[in-house]
Swiss-Prot record:
Protein name, UniProt field: Mycothiol acetyltransferase
GO molecular function: mycothiol synthase activity; protein-N-terminal-alanine acetyltransferase activity
Cross-referenced Gene3D superfamilies: 3.40.630.30
Function: Catalyzes the transfer of acetyl from acetyl-CoA to desacetylmycothiol (Cys-GlcN-Ins) to form mycothiol.
Pfam families in UniProt: Acetyltransf_1
Upper classification of the organism: Bacteria, Bacillati, Actinomycetota, Actinomycetes, Mycobacteriales
Native source species: Mycobacterium leprae (strain TN)
Binding-site residues, acetyl-CoA 2: 239-241, 246-252, 283-288
UniProt catalytic activity: 1D-myo-inositol 2-(L-cysteinylamino)-2-deoxy-alpha-D-glucopyranoside + acetyl-CoA = mycothiol + CoA + H(+)
Gene name tied to this protein: mshD
Subunit (UniProt): Monomer.
Entry EC no(s): 2.3.1.189
Length: 311
């Protein structure tokens, strides 16, 4: 096999990589990469590793995306091997190549923590360093949304770029130091707004009301998402509360409002309406809040790294 690092992919290479990701998703019933990797295929902000057979004009059989470290973090890699090309060492070869490029200082996401990923990690001396839990619940029967004014806030939906500065402020304060969600820029927000699934009516903003000590200030938000490729599936995409307003129940209130909105949009005869979300496995308080709202664990994504990396 031949491994080639690229700073950018051609349009044809992007198409072929997407086809491999689609084939793996259908085969494993879980996407091998996160949405950010799909977003980065058309840019040169990350590094791309392509694997082909050694014969001329051979098709791409494996792909790895390597993102640069953010702040004091480490580089993150996500990879996929075409289902027809597995058990040939392709995945292990890509992992070794990424470790060689970063001096061993990167992590690897294993979405769904499949048996094959666990086996490869064990052989290469990688250990779990982070777990992201996907939780789900049915939208058939949901509790009534909480009343905002009982918490000293009023809620409206996103009206446009006039909201962006405050949205970024709260997001970056709520997720300070978070490897994916923290440190967003206006460009990153605009990219997500340009996604086909974006619906301003599904982005809820909570402001301090006249009775609060922070009138008119954005205190939290709940960004919901409808998965067009999966009928009936919605997501608590981002839920952020300003640290100055935490501990008041705003997160639970915003969650209940967003879930009620998703239920209205998704309940129908064609599919079982479901809402999903992600939570860090060590965020016990958040997990308990979601459990009280009826969520249960659906799957776990695991980040692996060499045993010596514990930061």
């Amino acid at each position: 096999m031949v491994l080639n690092w690229r700073f950018a992919l051609s349009a044809d290479e992007q198409r072929l990589v997407r086809e491999i990701i689609s084939a793996a998703t259908e085969f494993d019933e879980v996407s091998p990469v996160g949405e950010q990797v799909l977003r980065e295929l058309g840019y040169d902000r990350t590094e791309h590793l392509l694997v082909t057979d050694s014969r001329p004009y051979a098709p791409i059989i494996g792909y790895l995306n390597l993102s640069s470290p953010r702040d004091a973090g480490v580089a993150m890699a996500e990879l996929v091997v075409h289902p027809r090309e597995r058990r040939r060492g392709v995945g292990a070869a890509m992992v070794r190549a990424a470790l060689a490029k970063t001096g061993g200082r990167n992590r690897f996401w294993a979405h769904g923590t499949l048996a094959s990923a666990r086996a490869t990690a064990s052989v290469l001396g990688l250990v779990p360093v982070r777990e992201l839990v996907q939780m789900q619940r049915s939208l058939r029967t949901i509790p009534d949304p909480m009343v905002p004014d009982q918490l000293g806030v009023w809620v409206r939906t996103y009206v446009g770029t006039v909201d962006d500065a405050e949205l970024l402020r709260v997001n970056n304060a709520a997720f300070a130091g978070h490897p994916e969600q923290g440190g967003w820029t206006a460009t990153q927000l605009a990219e997500r707004r340009s996604e086909p699934w974006f619906d301003p009516a599904g982005l809820f903003l909570a402001f301090g009301d006249s009775s609060s000590n922070q009138p008119g200030k954005l205190l939290g938000f709940h960004w919901t998402k409808v998965h067009a490729a999966h009928p009936g599936l919605g997501e608590v995409y981002v839920l952020g509360v300003d640290p100055s307003a935490q501990g008041r129940g705003l997160g639970q209130m915003l969650t209940s409002i967003g879930i009620a909105s998703l239920a209205q949009r998704l309940v129908g005869p064609s599919a079982e309406p479901t809402v999903m979300l992600y939570v860090e496995s060590d965020n016990v308080a958040a997990a308990r809040t979601y459990e009280r709202l009826g969520f249960t664990t659906y799957s776990v994504d695991t980040a692996y790294a060499l045993a010596r990396i514990d930061d």
